[in-house]
From Swiss-Prot:
Impact upon substituting residue 289 to K: In strain: EC35, EC38, EC40, EC44, EC46, EC47 and RT272
Lineage, top ranks: Bacteria, Pseudomonadati, Pseudomonadota, Gammaproteobacteria, Enterobacterales
Gene Ontology biological process: anaerobic respiration; fermentation; glycolytic process; malate metabolic process; tricarboxylic acid cycle
Self-association and partners: Homodimer.
UniProt-annotated binding residues for NAD(+): 7-13, 34, 94, 117-119, 227
Function in brief: Catalyzes the reversible oxidation of malate to oxaloacetate.
Gene Ontology annotations for the cellular component aspect, listed alphabetically: cytoplasm; cytosol; extrinsic component of membrane; membrane
Keyword NAD: yes
Name of the protein in question: Malate dehydrogenase
Length: 312
């Protein structure tokens, strides 16, 4: 199983590469790519960690050598948020980066599963889909927007509030991956109940958690370490499913039946071909139903922006 990380010299990329080097199954290959010249050195640094995961690093304009034979490609390349910016302010720079890298994936490893981490995910996934479609290699079961950070944040905040072990809590999060489009389904957490005020406050905190980190880092970056952990969790789940493990479920932002929007984050059963089954979002509370209806315009606009970027 070969995993490629594109944007591997950045804050998310390095954290993700470290976690994959220590946690991928024995015999896996890990390939690191970034435009920055430090990338081969990041691979050498990680190669000294004693795990049976082969690692190589590549830098420069051409990602091809890193992508050859990849089964999973995780894309975290791009610029990070600064205070006062929201994820959509990143669009102008990151849209071009994602388009370029996905074109290279389409050429070199068209059958790979692709996880898009680069923000704004609501839009960059639509860009990736349109690029793959133009290249004639789009498979909607193999393209994912990685929203796992919303899930792990939800798990952490709920566990803190309710005095639970974080590992015991699993909150499904649907919708998209920014602001109001992030919808934690708190009504579906087994064995935990919330007051209306708690639901309102928690939902808001989960939606704004990225901004909390950006402000706390005081201009020195955005959420890189928790995002690295979230991306590793998703990537490792995907690898396990591709290798035939049964019953692997993760939420991610994918193209589905279009009931709510062309792309939508929901629980997915993963398998040997990527998405095996898009699972139902279940019964929503009145608060959640309202929030879902209220976000769809924003989500659809984000998606249209990505489609237009490629097709203009």
């Amino acid at each position: 199983m070969k995993v490629a990380v594109l944007g591997a010299a950045g804050g998310i990329g390095q954290a993700l590469a470290l976690l994959l080097k220590t946690q991928l199954p024995s015999g896996s290959e890990l390939s690191l790519y970034d435009i920055a010249p430090v990338t081969p050195g990041v691979a050498v640094d990680l190669s000294h960690i004693p795990t049976a995961v082969k690692i190589k690093g590549f830098s420069g304009e051409d990602a091809t050598p890193a992508l050859e034979g990849a089964d999973v490609v995780l894309i975290s390349a791009g610029v990070a948020r600064k205070p006062g910016m929201d994820r959509s302010d990143l669009f102008n720079v990151n849209a071009g980066i994602v388009k370029n890298l996905v074109q290279q994936v389409a050429k070199t490893c068209p059958k790979a599963c692709i996880g898009i981490i680069t923000n704004p995910v609501n839009t960059t996934v639509a860009i990736a889909a349109e690029v793959l479609k133009k290249a004639g290699v789009y498979d909607k079961n193999k393209l994912f927007g990685v929203t796992t950070l919303d899930i792990i944040r939800s798990n952490t905040f709920v566990a803190e509030l309710k005095g639970k072990q974080p590992g015991e809590v699993e909150v499904p999060v649907i919708g998209g991956h920014s602001g109001v489009t992030i919808l934690p389904l708190l009504s579906q957490v087994p064995g935990v109940s919330f007051t209306e005020q708690e639901v309102a406050d928690l939902t808001k905190r989960i939606q704004n958690a990225g901004t909390e980190v950006v402000e706390a880092k005081a201009g020195g970056g955005s959420a890189t370490l928790s995002m690295g952990q979230a991306a590793a969790r998703f990537g490792l789940s995907l690898v396990r499913a591709l290798q035939g493990e049964q019953g692997v479920v993760e939420c991610a932002y994918v193209e589905g039946d279009g009931q709510y929007a062309r792309f939508f984050s929901q629980p997915l059963l993963l398998g040997k071909n990527g998405v095996e089954e898009r699972k139902s979002i279940g019964t929503l509370s009145a608060f959640e139903q309202n929030a879902l209806e209220g976000m769809l315009d924003t989500l659809k606009k984000d998606i249209a922006l990505g489609e237009e970027f490629v097709n203009k």
